[in-house]
Amino acid sequence: LDIYNSVETLIQKKDIKKEYIVEHDNYVKALHEYITNDFFKFRTLHNDNTIGGMVICETSGQAKKLFEFFNTINIDGKSPLKTALILHDVDDKETRKSYITGFKKNMTVDVLIVYNMLLTGFDAPRLKRLYFCRKLKDHTLLQALTRVNRPYKQHKYGYVVDFADIKQN
């Protein structure tokens, strides 16, 4: 948390751009490794490979780079998670819709990677793991948190992994 606060101070003083940090290969690679390992453990713990996840990224650039890492790097011999990148400027509306259907109904997508889309009004009961890489506030935060609280099978609620220190909101 001290490192996070120090970085925030540097960003506020305009000594460094936040994008430089959160889109840096080393940062995104560590994020990818953590999420991959955590998500596999989560599914194993709950004995349910149908559970889905969502990563809310800090920037569109971070989302694109994270998606690239998910599609090119295999962690510890695990079969790669199937991910979909949902951004307004990537793919057309029909393609994004097919990815969302793949997540919600067909279970052909394990993890959605988003920046500004699907934070409100997205209803997918199998979404049980939410990774916050970005601070959201007020109504948007509340809406995003409720994405994981739909009943699904034996799961009454979902879980949040907070990389952005949302409790400050």
Locate the predicted segments by residue:
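Residue-level preference for the first positions of well-ordered beta-strands
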Residues: 32, 52-54, 111
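Conserved helicase motor "Helicase C" RecA-like lobe of SF1/SF2 P-loop NTPases
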Residues: 58-89
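Short helix-terminating capping/connector loops at secondary-structure junctions
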Residues: 45-50, 76-81, 153-156
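Interdomain helical connector at the RecA1-RecA2 junction of SF1/SF2 helicase-like NTPases
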Residues: 1-50
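Conserved RecA-like P-loop NTPase helicase motor core
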Residues: 82-169
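Conserved RecA-like ASCE P-loop NTPase motor core of nucleic-acid helicases/translocases
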Residues: 49-59
